[in-house]
């Protein structure tokens, strides 16, 4: 055997699919005898003020109470918010960083978001960049998973598609935010956050000057060059500034996930 990849030895990649429809399913549903007693690990906690690339983001410290519980208190927020986390999961005898199997988010006991990775559709792949803070990944190389359902996505693994992860925080009210994270072997971690509602803590960013509207075609024309964006090229509004520099066009920054490329 020869290993031609970046790992330390020969290995096998495989996937399992349902015969009807060729839908990929979670291989952990089968008796693979993989030892796993390790809980998901949480690195950072974030609140967002909206669902698109212009929403404000704020990071809050977490304190690890014990092996399974993280907490944070004294957080103030207002309006509609949703959650982001930097996290990973590992199995015994492996240092590979995996994603989690399922997540549930509740505010004062009411569930606002829930997903479970039993299967995944090939159609889900075009929405995958909506599950992360794409701008954060491109500018700071940090992968933050976002726990909300973007209006443009239609993930097959969402448990209740009527729960989009947005929670309304009202001034003068107190809230308990409880997040449950699980791997397939039922190793769980919990995040317990206490919030107080005030006015305008997470403000929506100001309107941009070079907005591309998703419902319109946009073309930037110069003397001998042009750039054309077909409508629905992006999942939401994008602030794209195009510069003509001699024989080169500089087309904005890669901080907006594209629907069509």
Predicted regions and their residues:
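Extracellular recognition modules
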Residues: 15, 178-182
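Acidic, glycine-rich catalytic/binding loops that coordinate metals and/or anionic ligands
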Residues: 15-89, 94-95, 124-133, 172-173
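Exoplasmic/lumenal beta-rich domain surfaces
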Residues: 64-71, 99, 105-168
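Short beta-strand elements
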Residues: 174-176, 184-211
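Flexible, gly/ser-rich surface segments that form the specificity/activation loops bordering the active-site cleft
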Residues: 1-11
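Compositionally biased low-complexity segments at domain edges in trafficked proteins
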Residues: 39-64, 204-237
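Proteolytic processing hotspots in large secreted/extracellular or virion-associated proteins
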Residues: 202-205, 241-261
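Short, solvent-exposed loop/turn segments at the edges of extracellular beta-sandwich modules
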Residues: 3, 92, 182-187
């Amino acid at each position: 055997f020869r290993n031609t990849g970046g790992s330390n030895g020969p290995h096998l990649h495989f996937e399992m699919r349902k015969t009807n429809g060729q839908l990929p399913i979670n291989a952990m549903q089968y008796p693979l005898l993989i030892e796993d007693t390790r809980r998901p690990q949480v690195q950072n906690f974030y609140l967002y003020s909206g669902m698109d690339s212009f929403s404000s983001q704020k990071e809050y410290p977490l304190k690890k109470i014990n092996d399974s519980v993280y907490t944070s208190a004294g957080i103030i927020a207002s309006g509609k918010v949703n959650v982001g986390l930097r996290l990973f999961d590992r199995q015994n005898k492996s240092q590979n960083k995996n994603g989690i199997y399922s997540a549930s988010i509740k505010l004062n006991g009411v569930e606002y978001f829930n997903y479970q990775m039993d299967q995944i559709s090939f159609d889900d792949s075009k929405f995958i960049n909506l599950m992360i803070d794409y701008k954060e990944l491109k500018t700071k190389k940090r992968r933050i998973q976002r726990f909300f359902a973007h209006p443009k996505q239609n993930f097959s693994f969402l448990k209740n598609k009527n729960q989009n992860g947005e929670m309304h925080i009202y001034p003068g009210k107190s809230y308990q935010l409880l997040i449950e994270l699980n791997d397939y072997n039922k190793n769980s971690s919990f995040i317990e956050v206490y919030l107080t509602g005030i006015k305008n803590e997470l403000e929506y960013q100001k309107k941009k000057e070079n907005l591309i509207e998703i419902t319109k075609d946009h073309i930037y024309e110069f003397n001998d060059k042009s750039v054309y964006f077909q409508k629905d090229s992006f999942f939401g509004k994008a602030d794209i500034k195009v510069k003509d520099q001699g024989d080169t066009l500089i087309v904005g920054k890669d901080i907006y996930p594209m629907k069509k490329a």
